[in-house]
From Swiss-Prot:
Enzyme Commission numbers on file: 3.5.4.19
Source superkingdom: Bacteria
GO CC field: cytoplasm
Protein name in UniProt: Phosphoribosyl-AMP cyclohydrolase
């Protein structure tokens, strides 16, 4: 944990910091990325986890449209760019250690590339796991043939 986040542990509600300074103090991984959890702002439903670099986060904060960093493509991934399933930013929070983001979003349609609302659809039990939701949309309709 950086000193800046250590100081925030005892900060009074309403304390203000420059976003730039907090992003400087955030704990980005060796690839310059930070995990970002997307949560539906009004229901609390956890939709997905993706990665952001600083440029993607700054774009998201500036435009209100969520942009992640695609590790597989090595470029910005503006959510909904190819599928139309856009995420609009409502809130953004850094956790107490400055190493994870929580994005409150307004998700239009499914968040998952499988066509499901959430990427978290495989429920684990001690002995068995099961799929607990069906796709809302056929992925081929979202993206065409892959």
């Amino acid at each position: 944990m950086t000193q800046r986040f250590k100081q925030l542990e005892t900060a009074a509600q309403g304390t203000r910091e420059a976003t730039r300074d907090l992003l400087d103090a955030a704990r980005w991984n060796d690839a310059g990325l930070i995990p970002a959890i997307a949560q539906q702002h009004d229901s609390g439903e956890v939709l997905m986890m993706a990665w952001m670099n600083r440029a993607a986060l700054e774009e998201t904060l500036a435009t209100g449209r969520v942009c992640y960093w695609s590790r597989s493509r090595g470029k910005p991934w503006r959510k909904g760019e190819s599928s139309g399933q856009v995420q609009q930013l409502v809130t953004a929070h850094l956790d107490c250690d400055g190493d994870t983001l929580l994005l409150g979003v307004d998700q239009q349609g499914p968040a998952c590339h499988t066509g499901r609302r959430s990427c978290f659809y495989v429920a684990l039990g001690a002995d068995t796991a099961h799929v607990d939701s069906a796709p809302l949309v056929d992925p081929h309709e979202l993206y065409g043939e892959r």
